[in-house]
């Protein structure tokens, strides 16, 4: 069975902008999304953040990039009022701002792995995850994980080798 993984906005931005340090790894991640090496997920918030950030550089390219995001082989996780409420509860425990929305939609869709370069917020969430579990239980969510797995561009290749071995893709 393939891993279900949420892809954070910064992965797409680093790939699109050919970031000098993380661009190559992020481009590989985006290619692997296309190859469906894992079950990739995202949300409208990712497209909004792509549009917002890239609009500061070039509004025309920003529009194209946001539209191209929807052409990827991603399962779109829906952000609705219950996700926003849960994100607010997460922020009351560990204030990670917009990333709480990403975390809430992940948890509500039983996704416990994120590929991101935003290490600080996700490390903060991971450290306080036990404090979020009672909220998950209170909201009757069926999240099976006991933690959030954070994959970065730097450790992506090693993680990819592990999942390919465990899912017999080699």
Regions found by a protein language model. Give the residues of each.
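Acidic, PIN/NYN-like endoribonuclease modules and their adjacent C-terminal/linker elements
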Residues: 2, 108-170
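PIN/NYN-family metal-dependent endoribonuclease catalytic core
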Residues: 5-7, 24-57, 78-79
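Alpha-helix capping/helix-boundary segments
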Residues: 11, 46, 83, 101-102, ...
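Acidic, metal-associated active-site segment
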Residues: 96-113
């Amino acid at each position: 069975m393939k891993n279900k993984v949420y892809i954070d906005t910064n992965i797409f931005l680093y790939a699109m902008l050919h970031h000098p340090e993380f661009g190559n790894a992020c481009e590989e991640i985006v290619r692997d999304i296309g190859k469906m090496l894992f079950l990739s997920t995202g949300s409208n918030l990712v497209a909004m953040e792509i549009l917002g950030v890239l609009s500061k550089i070039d509004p025309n390219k920003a529009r194209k990039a946001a539209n191209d995001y929807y052409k990827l082989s991603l399962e779109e996780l829906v952000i609705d009022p219950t996700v926003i409420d849960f994100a607010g509860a997460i922020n009351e425990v560990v204030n990670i701002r917009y990333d709480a929305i990403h975390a809430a939609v992940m948890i509500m869709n039983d996704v416990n792995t994120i590929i991101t370069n935003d290490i600080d917020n996700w490390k903060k969430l991971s450290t306080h995850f036990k404090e979020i579990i009672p909220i998950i239980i209170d909201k009757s969510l069926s999240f099976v994980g006991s933690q959030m797995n954070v994959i970065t561009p730097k450790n992506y290749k090693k993680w990819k080798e592990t999942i390919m071995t465990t899912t017999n893709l080699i």
